[in-house]
Each structure stands twice: as C-alpha cells, then as structure tokens.
C-alpha cells in the first residue's frame, strides 16, 4: 500500500516534502552550532520561539483564524520555558551574537518545517511522509558533511553510542511522532505542545540523573503546564 502511494505522490508534494526536510536539516544545523557558540540559556529560549513562527504562517499565509486566547496560552508556555532555562536577558549580550542568530534561525526553520508538514499531510499518509521527509533531511545532511568536510570517523565508542541514541530516540523518534500527529491536529497545536519539552526534561533529569529542580524551575514548569492547558482548552472550544 505504502509503495503504491509513494509512486503516486504528486510532484508538488514531493517538492514540498523535500523543502520540509531541508528546513529540518537547517534546524539541526543551526541548533547544534548555536549551542557551541552561545550560552545554553540563550539557545534554548531563542530556539523555542517556533510556535510564534507557526502562528505567523497560520494567520498570514494559510489564512486560518487563531484566537488571542490561544496566542496567550502559547506565550505563557514560552515564558515558563524561559523560567525553566534560567534565562536572563543579559545572557543575550554575554553570549556570542552569531550563536544567538543561529538559535533564532533554528526556531524559524522548525516553524517552517512544521507548517509545510501540516499541509502535505492532508494529502500524504503518515508513513510515506515520514519516509520522504527524513530521506530529504539525510540527503541534505550528506551534502552538508561533504561541503563542510566534517569527519564522520575517529570518534570514541561512547560518542557513537550517544550519537546513535540521540538520533534514534530524540530526533527520528520525536519527529516521526510530530509528523504523524499532523494527520490529526494542526501544526500550531503540535508546535505549542512541543514547547512543553522543558517540563519533561525536568522529570527525566529527576528519574535518570537524580537532579532535582529549583523552586524557580518548578514555577516555570507550572507556568508551562498552565499555558498549554489554557491553549488546549480554547483550541477545543474553537473546534466546536
């Protein structure tokens, strides 16, 4: 079934999917370089702005209605994420400006990737879209590795294990779920809930690392959850 659909995918959807994969590559490229060039607080907060990019695309490009209450919920969630990251506005000037720009570009690429995926998934099944968008991303990665002459050999076994785990669980696993979700909810919904990753990061750090959050981080998590629940409530009301 998937093979037949793969052959029948229109040129427009093939092009859109490749573009989405290229934006996903752009997100990864900018994000991983950003964390090397600037402080983590700046990188996390700036890269998490992708819901705002999706809002702009949803309203001005796809001409869909987004209520002010939905936007408020997303802003609250982003504010909570900022609190969890321990972000201080002074960090922007202390970090490397190029790193800050790359982190912001990572947010833009993520927003574009989500928005395009949402449109393509209306005509292409989840499995086929996931295969095509990851293939496009890997092609871009291969070109990037060759163009930048980045070595892929010579690292330690521990490094390769960590890279494999990051790739399979955090990248392929998470983004496969995102892309499958587009068949049931819109990109703004997915983008908004993805911004709640800081809460799960805190929970996992307690379970696996024994690191307990500060009061400030707990407050931030509460704001994130409140913002997402607020957004979810008014999104559900709008659908009705």
PLM feature spans:
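Hydrophobic residues within alpha-helical transmembrane segments
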Residues: 15, 19-22, 49, 71-78, ...
